[in-house]
Amino acid sequence: MLNGPSARELHERVYANWERFYQEGRIDRRTLIKAAMVWAGGAGALGALAACGDEDDDDSGSSMAPTATTGGAAPTTAPEDDGDDADDEPTEAEDDSDDAESGPTGDTLRVIFSESDLPTMDPHMHNLRTGIIAFYHTHDNLGVRNPDTNLIEPWLAESWENIEPTTWEIKLREGITFHNGDPFTAETVKWNWDRITNPEQASQQIGNHAAIESVDVIDEYTVHVHTIEPYPIFVERLQNFQMIPEKLAQEEGDSYLAENPVGTGPYKFVEWRKGQEIILERNDDYWHPDINPPYKNLILRIVPGVPTQLAELLAGTADIVRVVPFDQMAAVDNSGVASTKTQAILRVGFTRLDAMARTAPNPFEDVRVRHAANHACDIQGYIDALQPGGDRTPALLNPKHFGFDPSIEPHEYDPDLARELLAEAGYPDGIDVTWVRGPSSMPNQDQVDQAMQRDLEAVGIRVTFETLSDGLVFTTRHNEGQAGPMHSYNWGSYSVFDADGIYYDMLHSSSIFTYYNNPELDELLEDGRESLDPDERMEIYRKAQRIVRDEAPMIFMWGFHAVWGVSNNVDWSPRADEIDMYFTARPVS
């Protein structure tokens, strides 16, 4: 049985946030009363689901000091008053001249897009989903995915062609300028690729472009991109590679770019209030005729804690939130103020095991212990209770990835077999391990982790949580190899719908993200990213999946079904590639 707060406890937790908003002057008394009445109406619908567990509230903004905790839920800290929400509704005694609507005003769209801040405003110097989303608004890519066909279509590029097995010709749109007036040309494209593939730049995205050997400028609006070997997912990589102005970058340097993003996108950067929000203003000179955002201002807010986020959504001080736990969907949908949007996405969640002793020697170096951990966990039970619609990923790949093999069988829930495997590995009395956790976009992450902890301990794998509330601290530790012997993780494949988008980064021994080393798998992954024959690639990834399943370098979990909360005053839909495009949002008339 999965334990969690009662509907009353959850109601009180959300209402406490509204009281705080009122005390801070962020909402007036009328809004407080209205929000409380709305939530009371939805709380009854929540009751039947609340027993599924506590909300995912282990994230925090970067203004918090990193905190390590032992046990279940992570600490949270309320954000400071950022002072940039729409004005409060007036009370009857207030002057109506200060009136502002609840929800979008027509001028401003307010999105709570993260619980943790970004490390930088440089689109090349991060590996965070929230960074991708933010920079999709200020910058453009050579290609963009069509959500209807799932194909990459030209954007800054006018066309591309594989003119030789290892050469791609890209023709660029003419007449596009950056927000500072610099022109976008072939020199821009070459400079951006040269920068991100330069090892001295130390971009966390270098692996996305490891196949690039060189870029030649043919004329002002044509480049030839040469790959080391034939590169079948070259076009997929074009949809997540934001262009920055080379002249500005050369003149001002990396430190300037880290604070002042300049792109060609539909919104311009205004201000980064660290730990609080990113303020953007519509680019009224945007080059694409079909993109004309109705909101003049877009505010991307950092708000720790799902209860706080939901309180803001239902109080009308936020228009979109990126995470709504499944057990709170009914309350939002019945609120009359907002509704939920559900989308199966490419992101995969898993619990990584340090199979290569990257952090330190540990029991998970033994494959029998790794299989024991997988058999100890009732993955399908967690899906049924906490992740409705989640897709099993028996060898890490999501069914949405090209190369997915549906014949791979997942580990069965078998506690007795788990105990036998531990004993065979020399641990008849079990093991004691630390599980490192950081902020996560997985719905109900806390409940999932706690349920897994109980199941693991039932077979003798005794787990102590180390919860890092600051996402930047967790990412740094993870990438430096200090997140063993086990840690929670999820990966969105940089929105590449191909096995290479997750396997190479998560499992190839050269990756900064990996905690596993297998030369046979490395060779297959290299072959998979070099063959242009789809059938050959399918066979390569079938073999790779069998190795991954047999080696079990992580506890395999599921592909996400994500839930967003959207104000009833806003017409907007999420995407399967998990790149939220808020410039497509429209006010409901």
Protein language model regions, located:
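N-terminal secretory signal peptides
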Residues: 1-31, 40
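Detector for C-terminal structural segments
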Residues: 34, 38-49, 273, 277, ...
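N-terminal lobe/hinge region of extracytoplasmic solute-binding protein
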Residues: 112-164, 194, 262
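A structural "hinge/loop" feature
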Residues: 115-132, 155-156, 182, 204-205, ...
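Gly/Pro-rich hinge or "lid" segments in bacterial periplasmic/extracellular proteins
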Residues: 146-151, 239-293, 297, 416, ...
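Surface-exposed binding/hinge segments that line
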Residues: 161, 205-248, 271-273
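Ligand-site clamp/hinge motif
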Residues: 255, 285-331, 462
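Structural transition elements
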Residues: 267, 360, 391-424, 439-447
